[in-house]
């Protein structure tokens, strides 16, 4: 149902219904609105299912305003706004590039694992699914750089870039990676924050998925400690994290195509990347743990990112399994 208010008094009545009202209190202070009119207005709203009897406990009691708005606005059915791949910025701006430009000149090359060999020795998918669990305690010997590189390669590298010519939207570029992504857009970036890793100095790095390498952004001990401490608290304070994978989104890359559902898609992409990390880490006998919260402002300040252009949207802990 939809209400189109042709008189300001209708809007005033609706606004007052944000608080508990009786017909008498509803009609007060609004010119020419009597208690009888207020009763008929309420009857109309009930008949059109704009109002419904309150149940005990009401399901609405569990909702926060922003959660319900996000849920209803990113699904169809309760609004008439454009939704989906509307290409709303076509002709206004160019899409962001598939690969983010280097953030520093300090490059750490990563070893590419032998995928053919891995397919022969890796544990079956069903076993990985059954063994998967969140592990927050680590061995004294930390994760190795080779293991970190293998996980990033198997989970997040760019396997292929494809260019398609379209009549309506011109030239479009896509990439393909191990985890799925709506429209093959891949707006997510991965920033390893290293506390303890054999073969890699502590610091904040950016993973370049095409060249399969790390760019060091910061070696500042205080900044690393700050991010690690936040992750430690978010994970239940069981053990100091060895590596924190901060996942960001380059918003413009996905907002360029999708309308109404873009941020919901980002959340789904973070979820499938989490599961990909989990299964790969389980197969590698590592300790994985997804986090539910992180400080996007603090990460933006440390990395120099523009909060509205690229912000952290997920965090994932990785370390060596305690023997």
Language model features by range: what are they?
Residues 111-137, 248-260:
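Residues forming anionic-ligand binding surfaces in small-molecule and nucleic-acid pockets
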Residues 256, 281-302, 309:
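Short conserved catalytic/interaction loops centered on acidic-Pro-aromatic/His motifs
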């Amino acid at each position: 149902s939809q209400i189109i208010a042709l008189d300001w008094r209708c809007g005033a009545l609706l606004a007052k219904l944000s608080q508990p009202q009786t017909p008498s209190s509803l009609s007060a202070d609004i010119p020419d609105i009597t208690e009888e009119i207020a009763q008929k207005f309420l009857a109309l709203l009930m008949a059109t299912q704009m109002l419904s009897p309150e149940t005990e406990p009401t399901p609405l009691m569990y909702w926060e305003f922003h959660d319900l708005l996000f849920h209803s606005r990113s699904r169809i059915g309760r609004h008439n706004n454009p939704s989906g791949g509307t290409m709303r910025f076509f002709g206004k701006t160019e899409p962001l590039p598939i690969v983010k430009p280097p953030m520093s000149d300090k490059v750490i090359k990563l070893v590419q694992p032998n995928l053919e060999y891995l397919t022969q020795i890796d544990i079956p998918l069903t076993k990985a699914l059954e063994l998967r669990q969140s592990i927050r305690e680590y061995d004294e010997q930390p994760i190795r750089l080779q293991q970190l590189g293998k996980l990033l390669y198997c989970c997040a590298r760019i396997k292929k870039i494809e260019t398609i010519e379209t009549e309506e939207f011109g030239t479009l570029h896509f990439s393909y990676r191990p985890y799925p992504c709506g429209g093959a857009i891949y707006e997510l970036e991965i920033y390893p924050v290293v506390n303890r890793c054999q073969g890699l100095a502590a610091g904040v790095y950016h993973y370049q998925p095409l060249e399969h390498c790390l760019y060091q952004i910061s070696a500042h001990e205080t900044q690393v400690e700050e991010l690690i401490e936040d992750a430690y608290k978010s994970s239940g304070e069981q053990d100091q994290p060895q590596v924190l994978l901060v996942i960001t989104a380059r918003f413009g890359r996905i907002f360029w195509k999708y309308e109404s559902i873009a941020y919901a898609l980002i959340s789904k992409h973070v979820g499938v990347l989490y599961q990909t990390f989990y299964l790969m880490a389980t197969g590698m006998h590592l300790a994985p743990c997804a986090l539910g919260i992180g400080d996007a402002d603090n990460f933006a300040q440390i990395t120099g990112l523009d909060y509205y252009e690229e912000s952290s949207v997920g965090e994932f802990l990785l370390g060596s399994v305690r023997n």
